[in-house]
């Protein structure tokens, strides 16, 4: 394989870079190559190169809702956090894929636009939020996104409407076409700064009171099974505090798995499988992961 640092001298690229330095869980082995594009043109150059050389491609944002295997990731991994511009025009906020959801909600608040308060504490990037239709406290990304710009694997760029994004529970059409989110536009409503801020502050206080924000985690691990709450099932199964290696079912919120002592991706996966098995045995309910598990599971 060619040396990508020589192929792309204008893009910061690292070889065999440990991904634990970038993930919220503080786990993950090395990426063969890790690139930090700063423009859409640079993203396209990388995507085109991967296609032409039949390489694998993994695209990450804030890496907040995923577990990267201890063996790392093959070929090229792109982190989009340097594509982080946020612009406000009238009642619309457009944010690049690498912008944080939190910063985007703050930009909306500062422009007295309401509709994004639910996302005030979601730690992910805009790209990840659109990719998985992130939501919290009764709100979902699908309710406020009017369109998104997506680069398809063949390098073409498309502007997809809300309908074309085909949002579902923790799902969008981008998961099906292997596209890369470049930006998203949110259609909001005029509001009052003080009211918007009060709502955001309230949700953040609730989040801090209930969630283990003081420890590394991948956020909410499981999707909500129909008719149930994953956290309650895990609590009722007596699994809070269950530990494998350095990963533990949070004693503060059963829906979270936290890294308490140099946990590995394998530790996280072991806890996930034990929770799934136990909940299935006790309640007959299948817990499906919301968190994405990617990379080499060595």
From Swiss-Prot:
GO-annotated cellular components: cytosol
Under the GO molecular function aspect, what terms does this record hold?
Answer: FAD binding; UDP-N-acetylmuramate dehydrogenase activity
Primary localization class, coarse: cytoplasm
Q: Where is the active site?
A: 170, 220, 290
Which reactions does this protein catalyse?
UDP-N-acetyl-alpha-D-muramate + NADP(+) = UDP-N-acetyl-3-O-(1-carboxyvinyl)-alpha-D-glucosamine + NADPH + H(+)
Q: In which pathway does it act?
A: Cell wall biogenesis; peptidoglycan biosynthesis
- Which PROSITE patterns does this one have? FAD_PCMH
- Keywords, A to Z? Cell cycle, Cell division, Cell shape, Cell wall biogenesis/degradation, Cytoplasm, FAD, Flavoprotein, NADP, Oxidoreductase, Peptidoglycan synthesis
What this protein needs as a cofactor is: FAD
Q: What class of enzyme is it?
A: oxidoreductase
Q: Its GO biological process terms?
A: cell division; cell wall organization; peptidoglycan biosynthetic process; regulation of cell shape
Residues forming the FAD-binding PCMH-type domain are 26-191
Protein location: Cytoplasm
What's the superkingdom here? Bacteria
Q: What is its EC number?
A: 1.3.1.98
Please describe what this protein does.
Answer: Cell wall formation.
Name the protein family: Belongs to the MurB family.
Name this protein carries in UniProt = UDP-N-acetylenolpyruvoylglucosamine reductase
Q: Which organism is it from?
A: Limosilactobacillus reuteri (strain DSM 20016) (Lactobacillus reuteri)
- Lineage of origin: Bacteria, Bacillati, Bacillota, Bacilli, Lactobacillales
């Amino acid at each position: 394989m060619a040396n990508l640092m020589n192929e792309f001298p204008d893009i910061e690229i690292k070889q065999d870079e440990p991904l634990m330095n970038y993930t919220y869980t503080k786990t993950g082995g090395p990426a063969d190559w890790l690139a930090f594009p700063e423009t859409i043109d640079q993203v396209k150059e990388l995507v085109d190169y991967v296609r032409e050389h039949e390489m694998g491609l993994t695209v990450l944002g804030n890496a907040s809702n995923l577990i990267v295997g201890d063996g790392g990731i093959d070929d090229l991994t792109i982190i989009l956090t340097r594509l982080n511009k946020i612009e406000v025009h009238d009642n619309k906020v457009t944010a690049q894929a690498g912008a944080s959801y939190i910063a985007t909600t703050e930009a909306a608040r500062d422009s007295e636009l309401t509709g994004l308060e639910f996302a005030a504490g979601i730690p992910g990037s805009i790209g990840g939020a659109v990719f998985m239709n992130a939501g919290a406290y009764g709100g979902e990304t699908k309710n406020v996104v009017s369109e998104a710009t997506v680069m398809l694997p063949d390098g073409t760029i498309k502007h997809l409407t809300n309908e074309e994004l085909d949002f579902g529970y923790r799902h969008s059409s981008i998961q099906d076409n292997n596209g890369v989110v470049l930006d998203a536009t949110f259609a909001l409503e005029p509001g009052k700064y003080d009211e918007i801020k009060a709502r955001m502050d309230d949700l953040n206080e609730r989040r801090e009171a209930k969630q283990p924000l003081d420890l590394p985690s991948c956020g909410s691990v499981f999707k909500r099974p129909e008719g149930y709450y994953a956290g309650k099932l895990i609590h009722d199964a007596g699994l809070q505090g269950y530990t494998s290696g350095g990963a533990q079912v949070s004693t503060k919120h059963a829906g979270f798995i936290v890294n308490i002592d140099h946990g590995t991706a394998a530790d996280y996966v072991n806890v996930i499988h034990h929770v799934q098995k136990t909940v299935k045995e006790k309640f007959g309910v299948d817990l499906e992961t919301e968190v994405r598990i990617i990379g080499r599971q060595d």
